[in-house]
């Protein structure tokens, strides 16, 4: 069913996001079941979940790639993206949030906000994505809905408000009171939660529910001060407020990111999922509510604003690449304006390349249906795009617009990889090329000294899973080295160099002469190369060769061969020879010159620092902190609740290999930890000397 048959206001593009074990994929599975997409409920722990379609996901019981699927509910079309909760796959979360209009954050009723929930929440803040929350696993020992709501306020700074009051808890959890309709919902276990009975609120809960409802109405009145009629009703006659009036104000508050309503339930036991579906439709924004999309007009370099209209100019963002053994390369896109038709020729404005769409597919996890067109608000997949990668803009040939790009973090961990046999060499190159196209945080490079192929990623699990995929999908057998830290080099003071490259060996010689000035760039800004050549001392046609040589020279540092970052290079002077100068000579000279300048600019080695969060029983707290200190960690703070303590620290990645195993033995298996890349910092001198020796 295309969006042509759907009013734009009835479309919801949503993500489901959470910490690794909060039950996110199970929640999505139940949504698919109740909305009629699957006839049998998939269980994650049995390896049968529809959304976890990669073999590695079904084995590990975690979600790695964001599967996209479409369901219909209450007359609305909901495009759902299930995102991974493991920190090694933050890129999947990042790129999903970039193209979503709203999200459901799933929390565990026992743990509340966990470290990874904070990361995902911050990513959603960055893109201004409206969110509602679902406190899952209400049937677990120690489940506490109200404590989970409080932890959202404290740790996330969310304006979290309960819209349910649970009836019973742990194994006695039977349903919830809906504070808006003021009805108690009791789920019938024999119908798999598909049916429930509405009853009056029991006497023992009446007072608590009245208080919660009054708090909710007061909050709604304050977040929409322009709605005076609603405010007066709340103050003077709250009982006269209709459900529709509450839903209207709630919807406005959610879309404006002023409130995060919190529901409760247990997806695994089928309680509360339809209630969640109802409010996804009622409260989360449509593409219209999210407003115009901003971009840059390439012809005028002016910022432009595009309305979400079917008949508008085409503007779409490629947000994921997938390689399929039968169909080939599939590009997932989100359309912000206009309509995309099968067979049409379009422009990739990011790369200035023409593309042709051979097929359009609507995805349901890894099943697919052919479509003739996608239109504004759609999330779909295209076959036939050769040049487009994640973050590229697709538009009409005559309307050159570029949308805001997706930013990707640098990898922090390296491994050497080599084919087991000569026959595997070509297959390995093909596999690495496909995987790095799919995942922008996976990089492939060659160590110039040893000639080894190096793969880099966001963590050990990330590279492990990619290695698994090589064996399964590309049938490549490869040997992989031990994980190594992905160090970088930079300079700390300004420097300069004058370099001549002269070769005479009979016949035509080689001649190039380049003078450079270098200085540290702002941290995180990357390398910049500018030409300040005047008067043609180096002819125009050789400048690109000098720049290419400098860029290649920066790829291998002067201390230990790690790539140089945050260096600003200016080409200031030089000379040439009428006969002997060539592009090759200037390229070699550029590379030699930048190396020479860097040696004079007090180079240092930088190491990735990880943000580490450890949750441990309080009686092991001293051991955990002592161990982090021994690993050169900087303790940022700690907080305790219900006998458990959370320690937040910044620790160099080089000290964290095998940490999970040692934490397990330190705390008898009772502590858990997460870590994610935070920033790069200068390595202590003694450690720098050891790295250089190696």
UniProtKB/Swiss-Prot annotation:
Residue sites binding GTP per the record: 18-25, 82-86, 136-139
One function term, GO molecular function aspect: GTPase activity
Gene: fusA
SMART domains (UniProt xref): EFG_C (SM00838), EFG_IV (SM00889)
Family recorded in the similarity comment: Belongs to the TRAFAC class translation factor GTPase superfamily. Classic translation factor GTPase family. EF-G/EF-2 subfamily.
Function: Catalyzes the GTP-dependent ribosomal translocation step during translation elongation. During this step, the ribosome changes from the pre-translocational (PRE) to the post-translocational (POST) state as the newly formed A-site-bound peptidyl-tRNA and P-site-bound deacylated tRNA move to the P and E sites, respectively. Catalyzes the coordinated movement of the two tRNA molecules, the mRNA and conformational changes in the ribosome.
The name this protein goes by in its record: Elongation factor G
GO CC, any one term: cytoplasm
Organism of derivation: Chlamydia pneumoniae (Chlamydophila pneumoniae)
Keywords: Cytoplasm, Elongation factor, GTP-binding, Nucleotide-binding, Protein biosynthesis
Main location class: cytoplasm
Subcellular location(s) of the protein: Cytoplasm
GO biological process: ribosome disassembly
InterPro entries membership: EFG_II, EFG_III, EFG_III/V, EFG_IV, EFG_V, EFG_V-like, EFTu-like_2, G_TR_CS
Pfam families registered for this protein in UniProt: EFG_C (PF00679), EFG_III (PF14492), EFG_IV (PF03764), GTP_EFTU (PF00009), GTP_EFTU_D2 (PF03144)
Residue intervals of the tr-type G domain: 9-288
């Amino acid at each position: 069913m295309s969006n042509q048959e759907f009013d734009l206001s009835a479309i919801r593009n949503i993500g489901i996001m959470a910490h690794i074990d909060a039950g996110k994929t199970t929640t999505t599975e139940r949504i698919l079941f109740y909305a009629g997409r699957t006839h049998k409920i998939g269980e994650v722990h049995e390896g049968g979940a529809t959304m976890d379609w990669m073999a590695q996901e079904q084995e590990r019981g975690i979600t790695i790639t964001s599967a996209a699927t479409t369901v219909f509910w209450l007359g609305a079309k909901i495009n759902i993206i299930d995102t991974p909760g493991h920190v090694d796959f933050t890129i999947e979360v990042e790129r999903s949030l970039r193209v979503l209009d709203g999200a459901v954050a799933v929390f565990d009723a026992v743990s509340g906000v966990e470290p990874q929930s904070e990361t995902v929440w911050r990513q959603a803040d960055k893109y201004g994505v409206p969110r509602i929350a679902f406190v899952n696993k209400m049937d677990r020992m120690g489940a506490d809905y109200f404590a989970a709501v409080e932890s959202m306020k404290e740790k996330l700074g969310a304006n979290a408000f309960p819209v349910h009051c649970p009836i019973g808890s742990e194994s006695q959890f039977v349903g919830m009171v809906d504070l808006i309709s003021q009805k108690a919902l009791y789920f019938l276990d024999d119908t798999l939660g598909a049916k429930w009975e509405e009853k009056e609120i029991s006497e023992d809960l009446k007072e608590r529910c009245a208080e919660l409802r009054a708090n909710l109405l007061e909050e709604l009145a304050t977040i929409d001060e322009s709605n005076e009629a609603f405010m007066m009703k709340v103050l003077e006659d709250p009982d006269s407020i209709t459900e529709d009036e509450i839903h209207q104000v709630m919807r406005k508050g959610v879309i404006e990111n002023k409130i995060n309503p919190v529901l409760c339930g247990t997806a695994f036991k089928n309680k509360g999922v339809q209630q969640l579906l109802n409010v996804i439709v009622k409260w989360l924004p449509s593409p219209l509510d999210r407003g115009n999309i901003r971009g840059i007009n390439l012809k005028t370099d002016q910022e432009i604003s595009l309305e979400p209209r079917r008949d508008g100019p085409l503007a779409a963002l490629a947000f994921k690449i997938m390689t399929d053994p039968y169909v080939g390369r599939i590009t997932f896109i989100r359309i912000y304006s206009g309509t995309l038709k099968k067979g049409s020729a379009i422009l990739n404005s990011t790369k200035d390349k023409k593309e042709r769409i051979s097929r359009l597919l609507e995805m349901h996890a890894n099943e697919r249906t052919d479509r003739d067109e996608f239109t504004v608000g759609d999330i779909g997949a295209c076959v036939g795009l050769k040049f487009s990668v994640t973050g590229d803009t697709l538009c009409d040939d005559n309307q050159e617009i570029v949308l805001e790009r997706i930013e990707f973090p640098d990898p922090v961990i390296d491994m050497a990889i080599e084919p087991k046999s000569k026959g595997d060499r070509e297959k390995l190159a093909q596999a690495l090329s496909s995987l790095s196209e799919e995942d922008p945080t996976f990089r492939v490079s060659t160590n110039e000294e040893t000639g080894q192929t190096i793969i880099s990623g966001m963590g050990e699990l990330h590279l492990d899973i990619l290695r698994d995929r090589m064996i399964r999908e590309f049938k490549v057998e490869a040997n992989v080295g031990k994980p190594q830290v992905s160090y970088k080099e930079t300079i700390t003071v300004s420097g300069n160099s004058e370099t001549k490259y002269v070769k005479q060996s009979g016949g035509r010689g080689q001649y190039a002469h380049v003078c450079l000035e270098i200085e540290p760039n702002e941290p995180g800004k990357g390398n910049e190369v500018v030409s300040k050549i005047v008067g043609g001392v180096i002819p125009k046609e050789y400048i690109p060769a000098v720049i290419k040589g400098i860029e290649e020279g920066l790829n291998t540092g002067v201390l230990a061969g790690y790539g140089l970052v945050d260096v600003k290079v200016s080409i200031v002077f030089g000379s040439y020879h009428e006969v002997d100068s060539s592009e090759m000579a200037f390229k070699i000279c550029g590379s030699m010159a930048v190396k020479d300048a860097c040696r004079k600019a007090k180079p240092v080695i930088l190491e990735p620092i990880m943000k580490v969060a450890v949750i441990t029983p309080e009686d092991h707290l001293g051991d955990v902190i002592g161990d982090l200190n021994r690993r050169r960690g900087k303790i940022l703070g700690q907080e305790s609740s219900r006998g458990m303590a959370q320690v937040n620290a910044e620790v160099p990645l080089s000290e964290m290999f095998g940490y999970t195993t040692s934490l397990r033995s330190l705390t008898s298996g009772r502590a858990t930890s997460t870590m994610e890349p935070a920033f790069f910092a200068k390595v202590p001198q003694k450690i720098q000397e050891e790295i250089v020796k190696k």
